[in-house]
A protein has these predicted regions:
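Flexible, glycine-rich beta-alpha linker
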Residues: 1-13, 34
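C-terminal substrate-binding subdomain of Rossmann-fold SDR/epimerase-dehydratase oxidoreductases
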Residues: 18-138
Length: 138
């Protein structure tokens, strides 16, 4: 969550927490890249269910809720309750333009799929990172 090398959920939360009221947070690229994020509790649940099953083929596990990086940054800002703007920073393209999970095979064979809304997971992540920042931990 610290140091600038974290993944997008932690980075967006950290940036929103550390942003000054009326300030801005940087988002690399145009922010139109899309991703889906899976909260750790559901990742663990998915792996546990897979391990208990008889299914033994490669399978995707992820959220099917896709969001643009700009909308994701705005979600972190909204959770913060601050008036903060997004500043898109022009950088060479990093990674793929869009990425999402298809849980059809997993759900068909395991009978379950992650279903926690992204906002709920982000609120939990935000709260944890905010505590770390406020305690000066890194």
């Amino acid at each position: 969550w610290d140091g600038g090398r974290e993944k997008a959920p932690a980075a967006m939360c950290r940036k929103a927490i550390m942003a000054d009221e009326g300030g801005e947070i940087e988002v690399w690229g145009d922010g139109k890249q899309t991703r889906s994020f899976l909260f750790i509790d559901e990742c663990v649940e998915s792996v546990w269910r897979l391990m208990k099953s008889e299914f033994n083929e490669p399978v995707n596990i992820g959220s099917e809720e896709m969001i643009s990086i700009n909308d994701f940054a705005q979600m972190a800002i909204d959770i913060s309750g601050k008036d903060v703007k997004i500043k898109n920073v022009d950088v060479p393209q990093i990674g793929v333009r869009g990425r999402n999970s298809d849980n059809t095979l997993y759900e068909k064979n395991i009978g379950w799929a992650p279903n926690q809304k992204l906002r709920v997971g982000m609120e939990k992540t935000y709260k944890w990172i905010e505590t770390q920042v406020n305690n000066g931990e890194n």
